[in-house]
């Protein structure tokens, strides 16, 4: 069965360069081994990266042993739901690609919070009914 995103559709890839995902498959797939719930497809910003560094989650420094290249603003990366929510509460949330965010993220983060930072939906959906 295909993995689902927070909108109920099939989970779409998050990022191939750098190759993201807990399983390094380009998707924010999750399973029992993924204790951190790396389920949110984020488009990282400098503010988000600095926030993560301040809370002890350095996403800038490369760690080749984990196939982690280090991130720069604009990269798409599967981040943990808990750390994204903390950044959201602290006013430093990264942008979110809803179609690439695993439904398991909803166990931790309300859909409304993700939608506030979504970059894959038009700002005004009124014209979509036409």
Locate the predicted segments by residue:
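Extended boundary segments
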Residues: 1-47, 120
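Glycine- and charge-enriched low-complexity intrinsically disordered segments
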Residues: 103-130
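Short, basic/aromatic beta-hairpin or loop at an interaction surface
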Residues: 43-58
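Short alpha-helix capping/helix-loop boundary micro-motifs
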Residues: 60-67
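Short, compositionally biased
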Residues: 84-107
